[in-house]
Amino acid sequence: MSAGEISTPQEYIGHHLNNLQIDLRTFSLVDPHNPPATFWTLNIDSMFFSVVLGLLFLVLFRKVAKHATSGVPGKFQTAVELVIGFVHGSVQDMYHGKSKLIAPLALTIFVWVFLMNLMDLLPIDLLPYIGEHVFGLPALRVVPSADVNITLSMALGVFILILFYSIKMKGVGGFTKELTLQPFNHPVFIPINLILEGVSLLSKPVSLGLRLFGNMYAGELIFILIAGLLPWWSQWLLNVPWAIFHILIITLQAFIFMVLTIVYLSMASEEH
């Protein structure tokens, strides 16, 4: 179904919630209105925009670092320095280990998630219209953080780092004891401890990914509802106030993802 064939608000909303997918068995684009009953599909729009925004972050920050001056900085350099100072201060307050990786990781997470969230402020029909009429794409979603696959993948990366730092700082034996001898320090309670600590450990990446996804999906859906249910000449009455409020949500969700990552890695680096 193309944008020109959409005749009802329900069809409009459904159209904008479809991802551009590729079937990994045939390497062909998936018809969003007749999807195959298979797990082997890939949301290539989410991957494309997340990679492009990640590269944009690297290019912009490298350019600032390359042309940084000790004199009066420009506006963009000042903004970058404020972000770096803010993230560095957050890491110093919350992480008590000695790893030099945490501050760059926190900066990358904050800016990358912020840029992905920021895509939600683009006009709903702009890039999907270009994708359909210029490139012939059957669907296109432009907010990577509104895709649960992206947010859980990022959370999985954080989870791997949690395991890495837990084993690095405590050793395999210390990490095993943490899972089996807490909170009840007696061998008879090892099965119960393992269940409790296992659930606690696994809940960290799940809650981290789902929190970001849920907030950004809801924000995207509200923009789609406004565009799909109201006539074009009255949409700005709700779009503008919601966009202003959504800027706070965008920034807050990037900050929360960064903070929880720092806290989880700090917990992994410390003894209970």
Swiss-Prot record:
* Top-level division of the source organism's lineage: Bacteria
Q: Which UniProt keywords apply?
A: ATP synthesis, Cell inner membrane, Cell membrane, CF(0), Hydrogen ion transport, Ion transport, Membrane, Transmembrane, Transmembrane helix, Transport
Task: Kindly list the GO CC terms recorded for this protein.
Answer: plasma membrane; proton-transporting ATP synthase complex
According to its UniProt entry, one GO biological process term is: proton motive force-driven plasma membrane ATP synthesis
Q: Which coarse location class applies to the principal site listed for this UniProt protein?
A: membrane
* Topological category with respect to the lipid bilayer: Multi-pass membrane protein
One of its Pfam families is ATP-synt_A
Transmembrane residue ranges: 41-61, 101-121, 147-167, 212-232, 243-263
CDD domains under this entry? ATP-synt_Fo_a_6
Which compartments does it reside in? Answer: Cell inner membrane
Q: What would you give as a GO molecular function for this chain, any one? A: proton-transporting ATP synthase activity, rotational mechanism
Quaternary structure and interacting proteins, as annotated:
F-type ATPases have 2 components, CF(1) - the catalytic core - and CF(0) - the membrane proton channel. CF(1) has five subunits: alpha(3), beta(3), gamma(1), delta(1), epsilon(1). CF(0) has three main subunits: a(1), b(2) and c(9-12). The alpha and beta chains form an alternating ring which encloses part of the gamma chain. CF(1) is attached to CF(0) by a central stalk formed by the gamma and epsilon chains, while a peripheral stalk is formed by the delta and b chains.
* HAMAP family xrefs: ATP_synth_a_bact
| NCBIfam families, A to Z | ATP_synt_6_or_A, PRK05815.1-1
Tell me its family: Belongs to the ATPase A chain family.
Q: Which PANTHER family match?
A: ATP SYNTHASE SUBUNIT A, CHLOROPLASTIC
Known role: Key component of the proton channel; it plays a direct role in the translocation of protons across the membrane.
Q: Protein name, please?
A: ATP synthase subunit a
Organism, as annotated: Cronobacter sakazakii (strain ATCC BAA-894)
